[in-house]
Amino acid sequence: IYWYTATKQSDGSYAAQVNLKNHGYNYSTYNIHVYVTSSTQVKMVAGVTTTEVYPPAVNLKTELAADELTCNLTASNVKLSGGVQKVYFAVWSDNGGQDDLVWYEAQESGGVWKRNISIADHKTDGTYEVHLYAENSSGKRIFMGNTTFDVSSISVQKIQAKNVDAVNGSFDVVVSGFVSPSGVHTVQVPVWSKDDQSDIYWYTATRQSDGSYAAQVNIKNHGYNYGKYTIHTYVTAGNGVYKFTGSTSATINVPTTTMQVGIQA
């Protein structure tokens, strides 16, 4: 609370100028009470009112790079009573709540606050929340506005089990048709044959000349089990986004043998 003494105006009214510095530079709803002291020194309430004081609207923009590796954040018209000391962008993805929240300090140039962020700091696809905070001369961070941007998911068009070899106990997993603006960093292929996944083995696929990724599965990594194998694929994109991208299966049967019986006379 701060008590102001109003000054009489030429029209007979009284006026007082309120300054936010007297109230910790707080932006909020302000309560105003008017007290009048009579000529007999009696003080009484003459009226009450409220007014809302908030920062001016900011111009907050996001520009996601075509390869979705980075996103450029900018904010202009960032103004506070008492001046702006620092500006921060609080960024997180909707997927998983705020478990990937990062506070980025912006840099000012020509009245525009900027920060280029890496999607790899969050490793998530979907909608990203961007909240803007300005720090006043008292060190308090004040919310100024918010916006969003979207990072693409990852998908593949084909997951194939090829070259099933019962004799050598192996088959190839080929993953192709990647849809990922930031490219492909790694492709992992977990494979198992038992219902409880006790024989699961993770293979790292290798990039082929045609852009596909391939991994060779060998039953020696699965206790030499024969039968149906479940195959899943996980892709890490160039921007760190990690996604399950599909599944298939393959069957390795016990190799058949030929037995010859000869009867000697």
Question: How should each PLM-predicted stretch be described?
Answer:
Residues 26-32, 126-130, 225-231:
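Exposed beta-strand face motif in extracellular beta-rich ectodomains
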Residues 1, 27-29, 79-101, 178-201, ...:
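Solvent-exposed loop/turn segments flanking beta-strands in beta-repeat/beta-sandwich domains
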Residues 2, 9-20, 109-118, 124-126, ...:
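Aromatic sugar-binding surface patches on proteins
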Residues 40-48, 138-146, 239-247:
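Beta-sandwich strand segments
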Residues 49-56, 147-155, 248-257, 262:
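Flexible, low-complexity linkers/stalks enriched in Thr/Pro that connect modular domains
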Residues 59-65, 160-165:
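Short beta-strand segments of immunoglobulin-like
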Residues 34-36, 132-134, 233-235:
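Conserved structural position at the C-terminal beta-strand
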Residues 69-74, 169-173:
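Structural beta-strand segments of beta-rich domains
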